[in-house]
Amino acid sequence: MNRKLTLWGLWIFSVSLFYLLCPPASAQTSPKREFRAVWIATVANIDWPSAKGLPTVRQQDEFINLLDFHRRTGMNAAIVQVRPATDAFYFSAQEMWSEWLTGKQGLMPEPYYDPLQFMIAETHRRGMEFHAWINPYRAQFEGDSLRVHPEHITRRKPEWFVTYGKSKVFNPGIPEVRQYITDIVADIVRRYDVDAIHFDDYFYPYQIQGQVFNDSATYRQYGKSFAKIDDWRRDNVNRLVEAISLQIRHIKPYVKFGISPFGVWRNRSQDPRGSATQGGQTCYDHLYADIRLWLEKGWIDYVAPQAYFSIEFDKVPYKTLVDWWADNSFGRHVYVGHAPYKIAPDGNDPHWAKPTQIPEQVRYNRRKNGKVHGSIYFSSKSLVRNPNGVADSLRTNFYKHTALLPLMPWKKGSPPPPPSGLEVLPSKKGALLRWNPPPKLTATENTAKYHAIYRVKANEPFDLNNPAQMIALTGTEGFFLDDTFPADGEYRYAVTALSRMHHESTAVYSHAIRLRAPGAWTDFVITLINTYRQAPKNGKKQ
């Protein structure tokens, strides 16, 4: 046992040493704009909450700790699963509270709070986007029918569902089903300040050998104009995606719509437009999700292909897959999905044991000449676990410098007015920045939503295009505590405002200031700020 522990300790030491000595080239070429996100899964309590039925304060503390960890790692967006299986992590008049939140389906949190409202506020406060992750078709997860509430939609509308394997899913061919799901999405967009609606890869279910998806009667009723049931199924999903896209744009045109499909659209052996891969199941042929069409039609704003394969995997090589998506995005954004959950010394693919696997994937993304716009990691707990030091590598190298999110030129927007009145007060806790945020504008998409903080030594010029000078993104509050500067010296700061769509204003600049130990007044101000941030508002914890 001691020998095993010693060998394990040596392995951990070797991995840590690798990242300490890793050349900083990637950090030096870090782009100013890059999407950096993490999936936070709630189904089966994969990432959050850590268990069913936790007290409200414990749930909130856990989520805040996750956000703080991922922001320190360099993330600028969180993709949180708010509807894992036709249930809700928010107040809904249509669907039940999730059992993975409260321990029992239909039971509200106690003490009461709205988790979605809380998560959005905390995410925005940290200068990060919040993408509401929804599973459109999954209704029951792996045979949990005994725990289903009597008022659950599967009990009220049993004719809408198909049992397949251990799960129950909506029948996509029924028009009322498509309308129901569209209404669910519209309700979230209308009532919550989400930055995006996000679907994952679950459309028609992954096929199980020897089992039939029993929708033949629905096909006979609604699919008469289609000679093949496969084409009809694809059309059903197309109709849903188009309807949701139109609904989002009608309610809040600035809200994005993104989808994270399985990595392979089609193999080239099936379609000359497909990738040079040998995927066992594909989006188009098995899940009936024609993601390439949705990009071509402009129905979605970004695609996040789940490229959960190593660079060396012969059947679906990572680089081959990324090349295909980069060349078939039709001008929309590509955020590549990475698989830190696969990192293990004894996994099925030995190449995942290499500490360089995900770092090399990120490097490759950045070499795609602007055709790949960022990365998403599945999932939160894998980054927190930090296998092979992957989170350390992101924090200290690839994401060492803060990044703004990429612009979407097809969406309306312009820079907000700049902030004003920037002051910097020294303190033993750091440098306290205070400024006046710009006024709100009539056009919501152009109102300041975030602020970017820049810092240089007093004798250096500002270059706001240099990501090394940007030290933080924060929310709309007009203050920031910088505790990252060297212990002594003179510095200057700049602050810009960013619109909801991340258009950046001109900057307001500070005078040079020598950072020394503070006076009692500055520490008092910092204490007041911290108290303000933690205080209940309107009698409820935010």
Model-identified regions with their sequence ranges:
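Solvent-exposed loop/turn segments flanking beta-strands in beta-repeat/beta-sandwich domains
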Residues: P438-N465, E490
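Beta-strand-rich modules
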Residues: D482-E504
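Aromatic- and acidic-residue-enriched segments that line the glycan-binding/catalytic groove
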Residues: A88-G103, R138-Y164, D201-K224, S269-G280
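Active-site-adjacent "subsite" loops/lids of carbohydrate-active enzymes
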Residues: A41-D61, A132, Y137-R191, D285-A289
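Substrate-binding cleft of secreted/luminal carbohydrate-active enzymes
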Residues: Y288-R292, E296-D314, F330-W410
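Catalytic domains of carbohydrate-active enzymes, especially glycoside hydrolases
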Residues: D61-D87
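Pro/Thr/Ser/Gly-rich low-complexity, intrinsically disordered linker/stalk tracts
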Residues: G389-V390, L394-E445, H502-R533
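Active-site neighborhood of glycoside hydrolase catalytic domains
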Residues: E176, Y180-I184, R190-F199, F203-T277, ...
